[in-house]
Amino acid sequence: MKRPIFIGITGGTGSGKSTIAKEIYRQFGEDCIAMIEQDSYYKDQSHLSMEDRVKTNYDHPNAFDNNLLVSHLESLLNGHSIQKPSYDFSIHNRIEDTTKVEPKEIVIVEGILILEDPRIRELLDIKIYVDTDADVRIIRRMVRDINERGRTMESVINQYLNVVKPMHNQFTEPTKKFADIIIPEGGHNKVAIDIIVAKIKEVLGKYE
């Protein structure tokens, strides 16, 4: 198998990262793409009580097991399959279930802090930052966390103001400078997606 290309998609919470990833997935097909979500690599917290898990700052780089993520990306780069961990947000902990991910022609790595770690940046062939207005992002996060993660509106708002927003400004926003492509206004920018698809095809051609 020829060397896979690694595409990093980052941006603030609710910016439209998943929308971009899904559109690339749609254009190239499941046979060509492996998906790696940084959210799957939150650290195991089995040693903590639920009360302490809830206090974890999930928007800080220390919340992620980047050593495992880097190891898995290197395995995919070398043509080996991995067992991607699973994280249950309702219990704030990793669970035993894993997902087997085979090496593919294109590996998409998606998450709020993937460009913060230089080891991950080094592995990425194309680095994308999805730049979306903060008001839009908080609304999207509220809808997601209430509907999918069993959160209350009050808890989501408090977390956004006290953790998410300051962490975004301190850690996520500054990584924009590392991006090759910056997409304004979220994941519904067709021109930007067309440019990304063309760039992916160009890079794929180099590895033929």
From Swiss-Prot:
* Entry GO CC: cytoplasm
Which EC number(s) does UniProt give?
2.7.1.48
Q: Please name the GO terms that the record assigns under molecular function.
A: ATP binding; cytidine kinase activity; uridine kinase activity
Nucleotide-binding among keywords: yes
Task: Name any Gene Ontology BP term.
Answer: UMP salvage
**Intrachain disulfide bonds:** none
Q: Does the keyword Kinase apply?
A: yes
Annotated positions binding ATP: G11, G12, T13, G14, S15, G16, K17, S18
What Pfam families does the database record attribute to this sequence?
PRK
- Name of the molecule in the record: Uridine kinase
Name the species this protein comes from: Clostridium perfringens (strain 13 / Type A)
Question: Gene encoding it?
Answer: udk
